[in-house]
């Protein structure tokens, strides 16, 4: 989770608390993961309270890894400000340090939500918490709009 500080100053951020819990187990044929996050905001007029749950899996397939992820975010401060995210990605190793990857991801927003996809090769729901400058900074025009992303790339680790 992150706060896009370029969208404006974070007010009262020092009083926010987060509870994070995650569990994963490698079954050999697949590796499921579950994550839960809860945000407690001391000043709901400035910061939203929410909880988020994510379920995903990573499965060896055709010499690479196929990853699938689904998450739900429940905004506990605003009505109709929840979101779903679904994504999948396949990564194929060309060498020990170089991978090709491709995937697709989508965020489905409620009518009062404007959550966006963070640029990059992953399949997780990321949040833009500033209700006045949603998705691309154009204000509330993007409330209730869904966001999709198709990505391909190459990753080399040095």
Task: Annotate the PLM regions.
Residues 1-93, 103-106:
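Detector for outer-membrane/organellar transmembrane beta-barrel domains
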Residues 86-123:
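A contiguous, mid-protein "functional segment" used to position or interact
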Residues 141-158:
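Outer-membrane beta-barrel "beta-signal"
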Residues 46, 112-136:
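Outer-membrane beta-barrel and related beta-rich outer-membrane complex signature
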């Amino acid at each position: 989770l992150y706060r896009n500080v370029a969208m404006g100053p974070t007010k009262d951020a020092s009083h926010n608390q987060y509870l994070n819990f995650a569990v994963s187990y490698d079954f050999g044929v697949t590796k499921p993961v579950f994550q839960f996050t809860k945000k407690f905001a001391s000043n709901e007029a400035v910061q939203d309270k929410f909880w988020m749950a994510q379920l995903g899996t990573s499965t060896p397939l055709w010499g690479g890894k196929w990853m699938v992820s689904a998450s739900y975010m429940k905004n506990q401060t605003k009505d109709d400000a929840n979101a779903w995210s679904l994504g999948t990605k396949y990564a194929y190793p060309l060498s020990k340090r170089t991978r090709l990857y491709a995937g697709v991801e989508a965020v489905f927003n409620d009518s009062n939500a404007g959550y966006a996809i963070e640029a990059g090769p992953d399949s997780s729901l990321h949040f833009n918490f500033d209700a006045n400058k949603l998705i691309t900074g154009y204000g509330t025009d993007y409330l209730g709009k869904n966001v999709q992303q198709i990505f391909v790339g190459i990753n080399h680790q040095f």
